[in-house]
Amino acid sequence: MPLITYREAIKQALDEEIQRDENVCIMGEEVAQYNGAYKVTEGLWAKHGDKRLIDTPISEAAFSGLAIGASMLGIRPVVEMMFMSFSYVAIDQLFNNGSFCRYMSGGLMNVPIVVRGPANGGTSVGATHSHTPENMVANHPGLKVVCPSNAYDAKGLMKAAIRDNDPVFVMENTLLYGEKWEVPDEEYIVELGVANILKEGTDLTIVSHGRCAMLSLQAAVTLEETHGISVEVVDLRSIRPLDEETILNSVRKTHRALLVEENKPFCGVDAQISHIIQLKAFDDLDAPIRRVSAIDAPNFYSKELEDWQLPNEERIIEGALKAMA
């Protein structure tokens, strides 16, 4: 099975879906002639032309509205946000028109758009370029959110998102773009709403998503080698729809839970997961649920401070040991 980067996996998904469906197009700032800010769309404009890759003005509200309107007429636009932080400029279009259209039309209209781009800190670009808005997006009925942690999932989830008839946000991570994983040549889809157990264990469940799932896996290996703790790592893949069953089954097996995310702690994704575990698996818990998240402050420009602010292997191990105490 070939090793390809997270970036290449997303590009393959986009390329294959453009070829599969004549209604799929990509739009955003510099996605065509410049090949995308992070080169995710490199070569696609040269291959597919102006009708399938559309360079837009620097107005997220305008091209998000364009995509939503086009989708109501049968087009399947993939909208690239240079930073997912910039989607805030288009909140009215995405959160009002995009999310509610199918409900408010009684199912007469769908909005099959994908909004994709990096949603992470850790790159020293400051607070306004480092948002992780998966919790905010997931709060809106009608919107779906996925956070691929590796190249295999990035390709499979992207293809599923493009084929879905509802708006799907694909939250990527710039720190993963150059990382390689095994990705098969043959066609496959990763279903929305299905979590993945990265590592089985019996003593502690770690629930995470995106890059934090990979950090949690590293921490789980260290915990087993150094402390003899058998950790099960659940990669959510999808925030909404959420695979509650996999989370609860794991917690019922290990009786302890550590929730890890790059979101800020207040009203984060893990606040909702903690509620679900408390409500549906409280009697199975042998210890309080623990959380590791970003320190609750705007992201720092300073690399040293931001490295301390975001979850890392050391902080995850510390949280796991507290959960086992």
Q: What are the residue ranges of the model-derived segments?
A:
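Thiamine diphosphate
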Residues: 1-171, 307-308, ...
